[in-house]
Amino acid sequence: MIFNVVFLNSDDHLKNHSFIYDEEQDKWNISPAYDITYSLNPLMNYTRTSRALSINGKRIDITLSDVLTIAETFTIKNPKKTIQEIQDAITYWNEQANKLNLPVNIVQSICKDFVYLV
């Protein structure tokens, strides 16, 4: 959920959250992440769309307070640490974009959409 907020994956819907049953251990586990991508075309003028799933009743302008409220609801331990780890991935994304020689204007356009919660 936090990755989707930070990296602007607004196509975050219920079909993108699932569990896998481990028959040997007779337990359910959260599935690995999938279908996560930047949702806008950085070369076009666009109106930012709202998220498919709400966070704390909101689909736009998600704040740290909204995320922490949900973290408390789901008894997530150390939510600020998790948020920071995800936000630290922005640096990694920039490094990879540069290694791939993505056009600077596209990288800059995408980077301006990233959300910093802390």
Feature locations, PLM:
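Anionic ligand-binding catalytic core segments
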Residues: 1-14, 18-118
